Amino acid sequence: MKLWLVRHAPVLLAPGSCYGALDVAADAAATSAAALALADVLPQGLRVSTSPLQRCEQLAHALYGLRPDLMLKTDTRLREMNFGNWEGQRWDAIAQSEFDAWTANFADHAVGGHGESVRAVMARVGQAFDELSGEADGVWITHAGIIRAAQLLAQGIRQVEHADQWPQDGVACGQWRTLALSSAANR
């Protein structure tokens, strides 16, 4: 099976802002362009699961407008990591000591004081990943962190203990990556 991991279009926030669980809109023109590009490459009748955050739902609905053969479903497990008190702040305004605390306990630290841990994110994304059918291709419209988690899950990695284990190669806004999965890979 093939899984398309699609990242939402650029958001309407200042560059360098932390916006994990923050529900912000994406740029409409970039969303339309991403939907148009994606519509041309997807096979007929795929199930499209989307994060409930508006930047992803915008892309899902734009894609459906071009491809009504697709089956849309919202899946809360595909929402981005909650960065707690960091949400809405500029990344460069967050104290280095906060990053150090996170990397010292990468798996279990509640990011931003009351946000999610990497372990919690991997668990919820793992649940969605485990429900993938071995025979049917699918699409996830989601976020950078969730795409990275799915990449790890596809490699059989269910948990990340250290920051250097987290994938560094990301997917740009409005772009996608495909994973070829065997039925055993998602069990």
PLM feature spans:
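Loop-to-helix element that buttresses phosphate recognition and phosphoryl-transfer chemistry
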Residues: 2-59, 111-125
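Generic beta-sheet signal
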Residues: 3-4, 46, 135-145
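Short, well-ordered beta-to-alpha junction loops that form the rim of enzyme active sites
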Residues: 9, 51-54, 77, 140-145, ...
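Glycine-centered loop/turn motifs
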Residues: 16, 88, 137, 169-176
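Short amphipathic alpha-helical segments
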Residues: 17-18, 60-62, 151-154
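Glycine-rich, phosphate-binding/catalytic loops in enzymes
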Residues: 21-23, 64-67, 91, 156-160
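Phosphate-coordination/substrate-recognition cap region in phosphate-metabolizing enzymes
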Residues: 36-99
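Domain-level recognition of soluble alpha/beta enzyme cores
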Residues: 155-186
